[in-house]
């Protein structure tokens, strides 16, 4: 008999283990919690559902700050040459520690080995699709580069990686995201602005 939908939902919501999250908070600080709701387009919902089918409903996003204060950002093939860039992100594989996943994903997407420095935001997103609403979670960190050259390793997933200023990210890039009509970009614009607002509050 098929699994109980309520059981599946509970297991998906718990794809981030409480004890691992507690350890990250202890090591990198208590994040500010936010909720956001966005209407996703059909193709966006398809991508989220594909990830959900693999048992993952989260991402780890890292704002990698260089010594000059600029941030490493990526662009994917789906929106290549649009002017839209965002902080790199990715998810943990089954059984993979979240911190290890963050470091691996940052290397694959940017070519940099990074060190996490502060747990800034714990974002809870409601992905609104025509047939249902899907819960998503983003754990957002400040990070710093340790070694490497900015050059995507996973060139199938990443079209470009570069650096941008805070002003660009919260200004023209966030506006392009909001004007795109994509629910995912509306969420990323909100996440980006909240990240920098919280960074100011923390004075880091």
What is each model feature region?
Residues 2-13, 155-204:
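Nudix hydrolase/Nudix homology domain
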Residues 120-122:
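A short glycine-rich, hydrophobically flanked beta-strand micro-motif that places a catalytic Asp/Glu
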Residues 1-10, 31-37, 79-89, 103-108:
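Short N-terminal helix-initiation segments at or just after the protein's N-terminus
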Residues 16, 55-57, 66, 80, ...:
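A generic fold-level signal
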Residues 39-87, 114, 118:
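N-terminal strand-loop-strand
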Residues 4-20, 90-98:
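N-terminal short leaders/motifs
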Residues 10-61:
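Acidic, metal-coordinating catalytic segment for phosphate/diphosphate chemistry
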Residues 92-115, 124-180:
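Unchanged
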